[in-house]
C-alpha cells in the first residue's frame, strides 16, 4: 500500500506559513506559484557533502491547518506531512479536488535519499524553516485524504473497531 512521488515540491512549516499568509493579506507576491503546487511540511537539517539535502522527515500537519484551506482555495493541489487534518481542511481538500499525503515520520534520513535537488527560494532567515524547492524522485507516500474525501484516518479506525 502506498505510492511514490516524483516532482518538485516546496517545503513550508509554521513560520513560513505565517509569512505566506501575511504576503497574501498584503497583496504581495508569493515565493512560488501556488496553483498546482505541492507543499511538504518539513524543515530539513543541514546538508552533508555529496547529498542534496540533510534529514528531511515530515512535520505534524495539524500545525498548518489554520492556513491550509486558504492555500487550497488558491489552487494548492497537494500537501505532504504526518497526522490527521481538521474537518475544515478535509472539506477544502474535497472542495478543490486536492490530496493530502502522509510521509513516514521518523524516517527523515531515509527520505533524504529520495530528494535529488534542494534550493532555498524564500525566507532564508528562517533557517531550516525557510521555503525550499525540492525535487522528489521515488519519494514514498501514502494517500491519506483523497480528492473526494476518502480518509485513511477514519476508515482505519472504523476497520479496526469492527475487529
Report each predicted region and the residues it spans.
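Feature captures the catalytic cores and cofactor-binding loops of soluble hydro-lyases/lyases
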Residues: 10-139
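Active-site/ligand-binding-proximal alpha/beta "capping" segment
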Residues: 68, 144-163
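Short, small-residue-biased leader/transition segments that mark boundaries at the very start
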Residues: 1-5
Amino acid at each position: 500500500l502506498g505510492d511514490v512521488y516524483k516532482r518538485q515540491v516546496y517545503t513550508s512549516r509554521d513560520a513560513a506559513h505565517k509569512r505566506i499568509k501575511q504576503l497574501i493579506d498584503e497583496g504581495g507576491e508569493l515565493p512560488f506559484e501556488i496553483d498546482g503546487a505541492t507543499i511538504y511540511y518539513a524543515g530539513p537539517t543541514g546538508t552533508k557533502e555529496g547529498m542534496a539535502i540533510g534529514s528531511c522527515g515530515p512535520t505534524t500537519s495539524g500545525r498548518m491547518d489554520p492556513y491550509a484551506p486558504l492555500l487550497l482555495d488558491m489552487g494548492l493541489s497537494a500537501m505532504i506531512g504526518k497526522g490527521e487534518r481538521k474537518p475544515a481542511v478535509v472539506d477544502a481538500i474535497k472542495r478543490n479536488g486536492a490530496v493530502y499525503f502522509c510521509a513516514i515520520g521518523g524516517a527523515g534520513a531515509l527520505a533524504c535519499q529520495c530528494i535529488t535537488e534542494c534550493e532555498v527560494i524564500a525566507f532564508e532567515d528562517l533557517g531550516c524553516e525557510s521555503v525550499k524547492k525540492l525535487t522528489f524522485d521515488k519519494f514514498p507516500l501514502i494517500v491519506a485524504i483523497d480528492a473526494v474525501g476518502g480518509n485513511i484516518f477514519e476508515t482505519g479506525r472504523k476497520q479496526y473497531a469492527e475487529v
